[in-house]
Amino acid sequence: PAGVEFVSVIRLSQTSETGFSYSPSGAALTNAIVNNPGARWLIGNEPDRRTSIQDNVEPHVYAAAYHELYYLIKQTDPTARIIAGTIVQPTPLRLRYLDMVLSSYRQSFGTTMPVDGWSIHNFILNEVSCAHDPGNCWGAEIPPGIDEPFGEIVSVEDNDDFDRFKERVVRFRQWMKDRGYREKPLYLSEYGILMPPDYGFEAPRVNAYMNKTFNYLTTAADATLGFPADGNRLVQKWSWYSATDQNYNGWLFDSGNGQMTAMGRNFANHTSSIAISNDLSPWKLLTTPATLHYTGTPLSVQLRAQVSSSGNSAIPTGPAVVRFYRGDPAQGGVKIGADKFVDLAGCGNVAEVSVTWTGATAGVHNIFVVVDADGVIAESDEANNTRSFTVLVGTRRLFAPITTR
């Protein structure tokens, strides 16, 4: 149905000290990639969880599997978006697991791990090694590849700890920024209440947690940590657990008769009250070639504008016209190329359009990008549709040595 997005998950399995397998694979995976152009692909599901029902792979194995799948998918569909992580919860212990993944990737492949986004779960679970304390190792255990007796210890009553939930979201965004991934989206692909009703988590308590977290995720932003393409919001998309799984809690529909539960009705009532908004703006301007060197002959430069939508519409809004100018169009700036168009859903989605700028000469140039110049689309912020970017066409190039470790 309209507005529903399905995200594919490729499950991982460690087969030896360095070996791995994944599912789907072979022709089944290739066909899925071809039949779903531009799809998001989650690589692994809770790879940091020691259990037979989750992926349970050591960090170096995750890095190797991710590398293989990233390039396999991108070679088949360059528009695909590859999402890393999907850890159980962003605690310090599990961020250490991800740091080990990144370190292994760099050691093995000589570069930073490429991602199109990060995914996390955010359940509030105990972290105790079953080898250390078998009587109290319920929850998330200790990630494979890490030998610690415990990490973050919580009680069953903490399963709806809202302050802890928020703290973890901020912690992960800080982790992303510190490792150079701030300009990537964050997806909270699974969270909710796992403790069953007979543990004290009846529907009213679950619904209260749902409402608080939904309100937070809808509005939480940080000018130094958030995703710039989405108004600096911390989380771009999230998914409540679960739709029908009654083995835990939070199910929106009865798995037997398909009827909506009290939690499902709360979900529907809460989300139906959220007004749909659109907010398009120019985000980045890139050039091809990346470095512009003038040697006496005017250059032909490809200007590539990335346009983002920080509204919340699940359905693409458009087409919206995008225009390029050399100089401020309000003061006689000269239009570059023909009109281009974008059709974007919200929550930080980005589209790229380009024009060719001919006759570029040496100097500093102000290139303006204007989105929805004719005001066809109603937006929550009409003041951010125009942005100027500085493009330098230099006359000299300096080559400097680079050392890496």
Indicate where each model-derived feature is located:
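Catalytic domains of carbohydrate-active enzymes, especially glycoside hydrolases
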Residues: 1-7, 35, 39-40
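Residues that flank catalytic or metal-binding motifs in active/ligand-binding sites
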Residues: 2, 37, 78, 114, ...
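Aromatic-rich peripheral "rim/lid" segments of glycoside hydrolase catalytic domains that contact
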Residues: 7, 198-205, 209, 216-286, ...
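Structural detector of well-ordered beta-strand residues that form the stable sheet scaffold
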Residues: 7, 82-83, 187, 239
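Early extracytoplasmic/lumenal segment of secretory-pathway proteins
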Residues: 10
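Active-site cleft segment of glycoside hydrolase catalytic domains centered on the general acid/base Glu
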Residues: 15-171, 178-183, 191-215, 247-260
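A short, local hydrophobic-aromatic micro-motif
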Residues: 39, 116, 189, 236-239, ...
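Extracellular/luminal regions of secreted and cell-surface proteins that mediate adhesion/ECM remodeling
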Residues: 273-405
